């Protein structure tokens, strides 16, 4: 797939997101000269310790998008079992097709060209509400999520306030 085809697809997805985007999510190209890097703002889901937080993130698309998945990285301090310490999100929908060596994911959960930016961002919001501690990216967050949920929620709420400058 050519970079021009990827660009057309990204422009179409951006138009759909601006016209019909889900609540709690804003996303679009970082600048009009580069449609392959998007700035996102994800609102913490209600009823979770992330509630009230506004989380900036960056989506980076490969030149063969949608054949290859993008990467998503939070650009603020973030504590979650499925987010690496550098902010990179680790969820099935962002994993390239193929076999999962750890046997945690079925191929139907992984990236395919029918996925979209909207589906990715909705999956991230779902991940915030329901972490997968079986295939953790942040071992400390996994351990705290399993063993001391109250402390985990306290840490996440503190970081949520920090996203608001409080």
From Swiss-Prot:
GO molecular function, one term: ATP binding
Organism this protein belongs to: Schizosaccharomyces pombe (strain 972 / ATCC 24843)
The EC number(s) this enzyme carries: 2.3.2.23
Residue location of crosslink Glycyl cysteine thioester (Cys-Gly) (interchain with G-Cter in ubiquitin): 90
PROSITE patterns the record matches: UBC_1, UBC_2
Protein name: Ubiquitin-conjugating enzyme E2-18 kDa
Catalyzed chemical reaction(s): S-ubiquitinyl-[E1 ubiquitin-activating enzyme]-L-cysteine + [E2 ubiquitin-conjugating enzyme]-L-cysteine = [E1 ubiquitin-activating enzyme]-L-cysteine + S-ubiquitinyl-[E2 ubiquitin-conjugating enzyme]-L-cysteine
Active site residues per record: 90 (glycyl thioester intermediate)
Family the entry assigns: Belongs to the ubiquitin-conjugating enzyme family.
Domain UBC core: 5-165
Keywords, sorted A to Z: ATP-binding, Nucleotide-binding, Thioester bond, Transferase, Ubl conjugation, Ubl conjugation pathway
Pfam families to which the protein is assigned, alphabetical: UQ_con
A GO BP entry: inner nuclear membrane-associated protein degradation pathway
PTM annotation: Autoubiquitinated at Cys-90; undergoes 'Lys-48'-linked polyubiquitination, which leads to proteasome-dependent protein degradation.
Pathway(s) annotated for this protein in UniProt: Protein modification; protein ubiquitination
EC class name: transferase
InterPro entries tied to this protein: Ub_conjugating_enzyme, UBQ-conjugat_E2_core, UBQ-conjugating_AS, UBQ-conjugating_enzyme/RWD
Role summary: Catalyzes the covalent attachment of ubiquitin to other proteins. Functions in degradation of misfolded or regulated proteins localized in the endoplasmic reticulum (ER) lumen or membrane via the ubiquitin-proteasome system.
Gene Ontology cellular component list: cytosol; endoplasmic reticulum; nucleus; ubiquitin ligase complex
């Amino acid at each position: 797939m050519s970079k021009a085809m990827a660009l057309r697809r990204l422009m179409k997805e951006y138009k759909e997101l601006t016209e019909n985007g889900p609540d709690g999510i804003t996303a679009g190209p970082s600048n009009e000269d580069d449609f392959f890097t998007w700035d996102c703002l994800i609102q913490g889901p209600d009823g979770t310790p992330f509630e009230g937080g506004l989380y900036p993130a960056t989506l980076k698309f490969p030149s063969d998008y949608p054949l290859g998945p993008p990467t998503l990285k939070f650009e603020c301090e973030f504590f979650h079992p499925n987010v690496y310490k550098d902010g990179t999100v680790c969820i099935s929908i962002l994993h390239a097709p193929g076999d999962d060596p750890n046997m945690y994911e079925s191929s139907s959960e992984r990236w395919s060209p029918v996925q979209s930016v909207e589906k990715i961002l909705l999956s991230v919001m779902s991940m915030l509400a329901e972490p997968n501690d079986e295939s953790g990216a942040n071992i400390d967050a996994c351990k705290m999520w399993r063993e001391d949920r109250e402390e985990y929620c306290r840490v996440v709420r503190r970081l949520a306030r920090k996203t608001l400058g409080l």
